Amino acid sequence: MTSPCSFPLKPTISPIIHETPDTNIPPPLPLNPPDLALPSPPCSLHTSISSPLPPPPPPPAPPPPPPPPPLPSAVEPVLPHVYGLKNSQLLKEALEKAGPAPKGKEDVKRLLKLHKDRFRSDLQWILFCADLPSCIQEGPQCGLVALWMAEALLSTPDSVSLERLVQVAKERGYTAQGEMFSVADMAKLAQETLDCQAELLCGGLGGPNRERVLQHLITGHPLLIPYDEDFNHEPCQKKGHKAHWAVSAGVLIGVQNVPSPGYIEDSELPGLFHPVPGAPHQPPSFPEESSPGALFLLSKQGKSWHYQLWDYSQVRESNLQLTDFSPARAADGQVYVVPAGGVEAGLCGQALLLRPQEGSH
């Protein structure tokens, strides 16, 4: 190592020339040993010509090797389907951070643990849920994404891609970019592409339709619902300006007493019950429509791969007030397909009950 104030280690000494000595010249005086010492250099590092340079410091130890990757599980996790993933780095990064989509029961139990104060402690709860795949939309394709997710519960002979749903919807004139502002058009698209039964429900999710919806869900069939989406994806009331689609695949029902037999209490959450798979069970009594906080829909939508639990009355009220086309969409310069009569005629108070064809397995 060379200091900024370093100098040559060997002093500059004139070379010694060996000549024949002159006997008349007296011998030189002996050198005084202290005169052999070199003056100290004008810097903080003192170096003697008789001492070697100190060895350089050892190199730093290499970092420890990374931990080995976890052993693969017996069942490979199913990652959410992301439409447009190949073209979106943002979606790729989000998907890598999020990991596999959780199963329905486990995701609902996570919600119950996080928001336990939201659910009435004076009731026991029965959870009916079916596992849906997750699909993240790209652009205004929330309705078609919801339909694609619902296909998993419809025993469709051949899987239909989201790209195929978009293509057919455009060819039939139901959409320009993937948007769906007509529940009736969605029903026709589902019948054609998924070969399923599609029942158009009018008049809202309350009144006599309420029991039909609940019976449909506890049987394990999907329900497509248009609603106004809040910032957290939950239902709100924006007069249709935030119109969005979700697919419901289950329901959480609060009851005074759990019917027996056919239900088993959850091992982690006391007071939560599940129907025993494959065992006959008596359907529970549905809570009165006027009973607050006793009924929640289990839903998914195209902006998250997690299930969400929504208060049934909030979904009902949001679905009933879809009346206007968004002014922001009207001014964005894009083309949208809106049915005659507008958003109110196409979405307000409507939902879609989907079932497999008779004889399907």
Curated annotation (Swiss-Prot):
Name the catalytic site residues. Answer: C142
Any one annotated GO CC term: cytoplasm
Q: Name one Pfam family in it.
A: ACTMAP-like_C
Q: Which GO terms describe its molecular function?
A: cysteine-type aminopeptidase activity; initiator methionyl aminopeptidase activity
**Where is the stretch described as Disordered?**
1-75
Q: Does the keyword rRNA-binding apply?
A: no
Bridged cysteine pairs (disulfide): none
This protein's UniProt keywords: Aminopeptidase, Cytoplasm, Hydrolase, Protease
Query: What is recorded about the domains?
Result: The N-terminal proline-rich disordered region contributes to the interaction with PFN2.
Instruction: List the protein's name.
Output: Actin maturation protease
